[in-house]
Amino acid sequence: CIRDRFGGMALAIITYVAISQLGYVITSRVAAYADAGAPLVYQNAWLMLQVPYGVIGVTLLTAIMPRLSRNAADGDVDAVVRDLTLGSKLTFIALIPIVIFMTGFGVPIARALFQYGAYGAESAEQLGLTISFSAFTLIPYALVLLHLRVFYAREEAWTPTFIIAGITLTKIVLTLLAPLMTSNPDRVVILLGTANGFGFVSGAVIGGFL
């Protein structure tokens, strides 16, 4: 019945959020343990990646979602696969130049936007390197969000929860390894940004198989 279906979806979404927050808490704790300013650097780097996705990725999703949702609701699997393939191709075409730019110019970007007042050159460089080493996250992140919308359109509420579980597990493992991979506390946050990216890579792979 509708009540049972709604209840199951609500439980799946709550579980999704709880798993996601677990990953965030662990990342924040590891970052703070390495360096007091690392959590802010990590958050700023993540926000910088959200800007191009918010402009380009959301636009692509908005353009393709009506057709994709309609085909998913109709149970037309072949059409959904075609739409998903198209969305993936458009994502690559739109975001690859931005990934290249942010990878190559992460430090100048951070210095231009953040280096003022108490935010010194060293902090800006740390942020810039974090942006550079995590810029690749944009593509798997966009693909994961595209996959999630497909599964929600098909009312497969638990599938996104399995995907976020894979993302978070990968992220936690790599996050816990980060302090062991460098003797420089300033570099831990850079590895945490990279760990976040590989988490979404695993999510994109899982979503592709499902």
Show which residues each predicted segment covers.
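Membrane-embedded alpha-helical bundles of multi-pass transporters/translocases
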Residues: 3-210
